């Protein structure tokens, strides 16, 4: 009923709502199925009922699984999710596709690479490393730290979504990637250098279950068909992001209070 009341007077639905942290999905898969799959179905029903102009599903490159040392995910790469989180997102994508094919609901799906930027919660790599470094805490790095991610600034992600919303061809999937591949350990060392902290803070911990080795997105389709180009280089974006967290430590402290402390102890202080 709450969702219906929100959707009935809306022109568009853009579904950002999700449980999104892989670590949490390993410890509690059920909430990911409920939120990410069943929650999507509730939104789709409301969008169908009230005839929205378009429904856009915000998804992730993790639905494709993992890559070797070369190659990129394209929109036609088979879905091979390896974690409860990515499985829930892949399932939701398929439900969205079914509503397009069955009910002619006007939809698009976007699949992005790893986001970074202001207001990201400290369970994610970049804000977690910044936060711990500022407090001279150990920086926990899974495995050998050489897992590779393709980093996309949140501003560039939003401009891409706006293009898909207004110009995307109905029923199509669009990959959104920053073409900024970095090993996790490279990111951590960069943050330490920017903050003037010693690399002795780095602590390698047991690797995460089902940890995908490499993600990298081919965003040719959205670039050529919709004219999207990212504004941020990684060098500029990470510098601005670090400064944002330095300037907004009160926000970070508030976010880290309460339940987050229990989560951190469970994940990293075993």
Identify the residue ranges that each predicted region occupies.
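N-terminal Rossmann-like NAD(P)+-binding domain of SDR-like oxidoreductases, especially those catalyzing
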Residues: 1-115, 240, 245-248, 254-270
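Conserved donor sugar-nucleotide recognition element shared by glycan-biosynthetic enzymes
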Residues: 84, 92, 122, 184, ...
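C-terminal substrate-binding subdomain of Rossmann-fold SDR/epimerase-dehydratase oxidoreductases
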Residues: 127, 133-270
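Conserved active-site region of classical short-chain dehydrogenase/reductase
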Residues: 37-45, 123, 155-158, 162
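Gly/Ser/Thr-rich beta-alpha loop segments that engage phosphate groups in nucleotides
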Residues: 41, 67, 88, 119, ...
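The catalytic Tyr-centered alpha-helix of NAD(P)H-dependent dehydrogenases
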Residues: 81-88, 118, 122-126, 150-154
